[in-house]
């Protein structure tokens, strides 16, 4: 059975499941941000446990085929080295899983933080959708909204 699971989860299948798997979490964050569903499933450890497991599985699969993990550090040497790394599908999956997990974490943080200031959930849908698509810009939008609701600018919380 383990062999069947291993052979089923190819890189393309993992990519599909990771992309589809986060959609319910984002739906809950956007539509039901203050519900128990959001607290239990999205802003808890649950989605990150799943994404972390997928991350470990990708790393394990990479290790089995002899992936050069030391080469990952060359991404800091320049854009040409980063481009070379993105030619490898395993590296793209490691990067993409990381990106999906971080964006979901930021979305959960935005929801929890917006509740402190009683920001309208309809208004919060905009930065959450943008965070899902383009993480840093959604966070930037949220901070602009937060400044108006908090009526102050704080460098730390």
Report each predicted region and the residues it spans.
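Membrane-interface interhelical connector segments
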Residues: 67-85
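Loop-to-helix transition at the N-terminal end of transmembrane alpha-helices
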Residues: 36-56
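Hydrophobic, aromatic-rich membrane-embedded alpha-helical segments
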Residues: 125-148
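Transmembrane alpha-helix/helix-exit interface in multi-pass inner-membrane proteins
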Residues: 52-72
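Hydrophobic transmembrane alpha-helical segments in integral membrane proteins
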Residues: 2-23
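Short aromatic-rich membrane-water interface segments that cap or initiate transmembrane helices
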Residues: 6-11, 79-94
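Hydrophobic alpha-helical transmembrane segments of multi-pass membrane proteins
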Residues: 14, 94-101, 129
